Amino acid sequence: FIDLGLNVVEDNASKREWLGANNLICTLPSSEGKEHVSKIYFTSHMDTVVPGINVKPILKEDGYVYSDGTTVLGADDKAGIAALLEMIQTINEQELPHGQIQFIITVGEEAGLKGAKELDQNLIDAEFGYAVDASQAVGTTVVGAPTQMIINTTIYGKTAHASKPNQGISAIHIAAKAINKMHLGQIDQDTTANIGKFYGGSATNIVADKVILEGEARSHNDKSLEYQINHMKETFETTAKELGGKANVEISKIYPGFRRNDSETVTQYAIKSAKTLGLSGKTVIAGGGSDGSIINTYHIPTVILGVGYEHIHTTSERIPVAALNQLTSQLIKIVELVAK
């Protein structure tokens, strides 16, 4: 970004022990005569899921870029960054008129949007913007996402030798009973819930006195989400009490939901840029969060642009070169439309 002539500032996100680097805020000043147009931003994240070290990208005859199969490709979200860099290069080479553009390159997105949560808001100077980080096809815009809550539960029983089970209280038994009572899966059209991790115990000949369960619920409806989380919490607690044990339940919000209208300026530029290029221009509601979920809470309207990568978070991840070209063209078109 510095080599392309941008002013680059690092925030202090790495002060948090779970982040190994800072976020970058890179600013491309407006071209002459375009100081009055809306200031916008784009964001992509620089981290990937594991295994993501020593990635060896391979362009195959089908037009897709793959890894060698031993790592993820990391197109989520290196593809977003690549398209942003190519856009800047094109703007510079072709001297395209443009307003001020910021590029927010975050850390820790895959760890729970932690970089965006630690982002220094005082460094952001934009009226609206775009997260370049959706698995949808290029030309599709994500205009909404759910709120996600995590529910972590520790269940305590009483240890005993397995040959004398009546002298103990099995934490595993309590957990199994609670899960059996619990409403999980697709709760309603807006809400899902899941218990994803369950571990504990020390040996087959010991009644387990402690187990830990990690779960989540997410919803586009805050009331439905609150009801579901309370249902899960109360089910753990009442079941444990009925069977002589105890449940310690911890609940935390990972990211808030958001919903942007198709008529909003930020969405209109995404739709128009896509349709101008012959792309779908459709808008969708996503089932997961992104850095855009967090930046929307900073009162900066944000939607998420489809990047076109496929099979993310697996060693089969791939992206067509055509999608990268289309994405770059859409980013440039957004800048051009805003500058008119």
What are these regions (language model features)?
Residues L59-V72, Y156-T159, L277, Y309-H313:
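Glycine/charged-rich beta-loop-alpha catalytic/anionic-binding loops adjacent to active sites
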Residues G20, T27, K34-I105, A126, ...:
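Active-site metal-coordination/substrate-binding segment of hydrolases
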